[in-house]
Amino acid sequence: MQFAHNSSIQKPTPPDKGSFPLDHDSECSKPMLAYVNCLSENNGLSRFCMEFSKEYLKCRMDNNLMAKEDMDNFGFEEVKKAKIVPAPHYNPNEPIVAGLSRRKRD
């Protein structure tokens, strides 16, 4: 049986920062659970859980579960400075019509 050769399939590339080993010994389970709980309490909005995220990343670096990196390189300050805009009102009983927000600006 012959298979067609698909030239659009690309070879997988490794992550930019190298491997991200699993925490088999649960060395960072407490900060990880604190971060996951924070996400759960904040509807998955990570900007409210940055301190927990920092602690988790620091734990991983301290336990050689990831390469040491300056915390400034993770973009936490950019997130703090970002303007937060409310999500548009959504009523599940109303139909969605494309282009309404553009029409209001014109």
UniProtKB/Swiss-Prot annotation:
Record's subcellular location: Cytoplasm, Cytosol
Highest rank taxon of the organism: Eukaryota
Domain CHCH: 25-67
Gene Ontology cellular component annotations, sorted alphabetically: cytosol; mitochondrial intermembrane space
Residue numbers covered by motif Cx9C motif 2: 49-59
Positions in coiled-coil regions: none
Residue numbers covered by motif Cx9C motif 1: 28-38
Disordered: region residues: 1-24
Polar residues bias: start-end ranges: 1-11
Cytoplasm among keywords: yes
GO biological process: mitochondrial cytochrome c oxidase assembly
Cystine bridges: C28-C59, C38-C49
PANTHER family: CYTOCHROME C OXIDASE ASSEMBLY PROTEIN COX19
Similarity field: Belongs to the COX19 family.
Protein name: Cytochrome c oxidase assembly protein COX19
